[in-house]
Amino acid sequence: MKNLILVLVSATIALLLGVWVTAYLTVWPPATSSVGPGIAVYDREIGLVPRPSAHTRRIYPAIADRSAFDFDVYTDDRGARVDGPGQRSAARYDLMTVGDSFTWGYALANKDSYAAKLGRELGASVTNLAMASYGTTQSQQLLERNLDLKPRLVVYGVIAHHFERNVWSCAPSYYAFCLDVSHVAWNGDGKPYIAPPFSNGVRRQQVHRAGDYRSPVRWLTHGADVIFGRLYLAWTRNREPGDTKKAEAMQFVLQRMNRIVAASGARLLVVFLPTNYYGPPAALPGIIEKVGNGIRFLDLTPAFERNKKEGGPNPYIVGDGHPSLAGHALIAGGIAKYVRREGML
């Protein structure tokens, strides 16, 4: 009996120690903090969507080559970024932007994002429904939900990393565990489809960030959830499809996006936003051509390279691949020029 008790006690201690090490000790806190309810809420179809009618301040400490900064994220009742609190969506907009943090306006006030600048340059009303960590898949889904706003033009800001994000079941995040999102998968017949998120990664992140696991039961259940999230992230990354499948996924989602945009009477402009001056993946222009049906493509890599050659202001945040204030101005100017030339509004 004593031996059995000793075994049970030892096993319990080992289990608790394993949870502590795997779910807490080795999960490093992100080099950022937030004041407010957070920018995202869980969504069963997409995984995460912008938190509507909210205000969150994001705070980033100084690092070796970058000063500390913070920025405010205000959203309207649909989750679109806006300039201040209490704003509601209009019944319709001339222009809608979708994409990831490059379009959302990471590190900037909404008024300084290329979406807001583009609206001012074109004299058009604009709603920015981009979201940090999104790929093409989630952008298409959120776009579809909001096409009742009847935009005349939809601008999708694509980056090279969306090829990976489209097939990842865990979105990029600050934590070493899964932030579950929708993603392209393939059925038994080899046909692509959009699979829903597997679990609630938003709750997992929010509980961990807030430290809301002080009770013994909460500590154990959240710890188990984090361990699952770490294992699931590792498992999915090890099963990542190759480049051919990633290109197939991109074409599949862009076709869906263009089809719903065209059916609504709008036009779709896909804009490639270079990260650290790198141009688009080789497959992207061919994918756009295959999608056809009026889709337009603008590669802004030459504009960024020209700005660099001419000694213009740094279009990137120092120590980061995201566009700076100058970068967003460059993007807005390039898109506005193209839209005017092609008569897209």
Residue ranges of predicted features:
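Hydrophobic membrane-insertion alpha-helices, especially the h-region
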Residues: 6-22
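Serine-dependent acyl-ester chemistry module
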Residues: 159-295, 300-313
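Membrane/wall-proximal cationic-aromatic binding patches
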Residues: 27-121, 214, 304-318, 333
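Conserved SGNH/GDSL esterase-like catalytic core that processes O-acyl groups on lipids
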Residues: 104-186
